[in-house]
């Protein structure tokens, strides 16, 4: 329901890419099928979804993401989560939090309660929206014991620090749930080694919209936004659908929401300036082009300007339009400003 669809001239249904995980899995199972594991892939590309509740906010977005395939350990989960933390830090987001959940804990909890598949889907949807009132009314209509209903109502409230895991263990006897909790404890321990455990909290009622997630899932929240700007998790069953069974995890960062968060932080975005601006005396164009190529080969960004005098170049450096200037006068290179080459 959240995929944009259209038709081709033969009336076949076409879908706009809703996320980047499935294309990455298809790549790993096709062109990269003989590549050694684990695979570490990254991408920056557009995706589009139909958001019925936030249609006016965004539909198409550019995502930057990573996928780690072929490694199913807690270390792999922690590596990807730590990378998500570093991505938000590198982007300049100052006040953020990564919330961790566990799909297997939720599914085990609902199975233990004896709910049908349809009932589980309804409860998951209400948990995703933190809609406690509707969830309580829905459970009241079901023929389940009061104690089961009480424990189910605790599920969306199981969020906070690691102490939440202790409470969760007291609410269930399901081996599936207990294994999921133990796995989360491992991930949290490894995140301590990465030095980013203070950026992480637990939300055992956390769910994802995509139905292919199978283990640890997470969201990245910024104080300036009312919705996640980053999401990801483990999707071990998905690669097998494309002919290459293997564990996998990853995340995607919304660049549109990241820019929105930065703007609300008060960040301003100045246009980039070149390292060097370069101009030349009459008849010196060929030499100037050759010199610009030499600098660019060394990793120096160069803007070639036409018809400026040496004095005008100096003024532009002084005004902050470049770090340095070079004026080519015959065979003489007149340099001004910071030495970056």
Task: Put a short name on every predicted segment.
Residues 16, 101, 253:
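A conserved hydrophobic position in a structured secondary element of the catalytic/binding core
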Residues 60-64, 100-108:
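Short, conserved phosphate-binding/catalytic loop or strand-edge motifs used
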Residues 11, 19-34, 40-93, 139-341:
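Positively charged, Gly/Ser-enriched RNA/tRNA-binding surfaces
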Residues 1-15, 57:
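Polyanion/phosphate-binding surface patch
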Residues 103-139:
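Short terminal or interdomain "cap/linker" segment that borders an active site or interface and mediates
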């Amino acid at each position: 329901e959240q995929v944009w669809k259209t038709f081709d001239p033969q009336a076949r249904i076409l879908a706009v890419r809703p996320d980047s995980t499935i294309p990455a899995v298809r790549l790993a199972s096709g062109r990269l099928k003989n590549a050694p594991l684990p695979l570490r892939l990254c991408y920056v590309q557009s995706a589009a979804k139909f958001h019925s509740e936030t249609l006016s906010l965004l539909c198409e977005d550019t995502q930057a993401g990573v996928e780690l395939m072929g490694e199913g350990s807690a270390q792999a989960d922690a590596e990807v989560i730590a990378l998500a933390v570093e991505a938000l830090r590198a982007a300049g987001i100052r006040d953020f939090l990564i919330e961790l959940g566990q799909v297997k804990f939720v599914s085990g909890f609902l199975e233990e309660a004896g709910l049908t598949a349809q009932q589980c889907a309804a409860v998951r949807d209400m948990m995703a929206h933190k809609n406690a009132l509707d969830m309580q009314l829905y459970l009241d209509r079901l023929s389940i014991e009061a104690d089961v209903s009480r424990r189910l109502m605790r599920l969306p409230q199981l969020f906070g620090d690691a102490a939440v895991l202790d409470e969760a263990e007291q609410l269930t006897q399901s081996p599936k749930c207990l294994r999921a909790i133990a796995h989360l404890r491992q991930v949290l321990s490894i995140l301590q080694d990465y030095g980013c455990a203070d950026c992480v909290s637990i939300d055992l009622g956390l769910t994802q919209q995509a139905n292919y997630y199978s283990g640890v899932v997470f969201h990245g929240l910024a104080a300036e936004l009312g919705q996640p700007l980053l999401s990801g998790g483990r999707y071990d069953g998905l690669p097998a659908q494309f002919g290459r069974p293997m564990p996998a995890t990853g995340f995607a960062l919304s660049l549109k929401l990241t820019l929105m968060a930065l703007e609300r932080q008060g960040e301003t975005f100045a246009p980039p300036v070149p390292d060097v601006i370069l101009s030349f005396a009459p008849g010196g164009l060929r030499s100037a082009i050759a010199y610009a190529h030499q600098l660019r080969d060394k990793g120096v960004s160069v803007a070639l300007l036409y018809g400026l005098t040496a004095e005008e170049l100096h003024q532009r450096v002084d005004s902050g339009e470049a770090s340095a200037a070079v004026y080519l006068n015959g065979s003489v290179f007149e340099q001004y400003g910071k030495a970056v080459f």
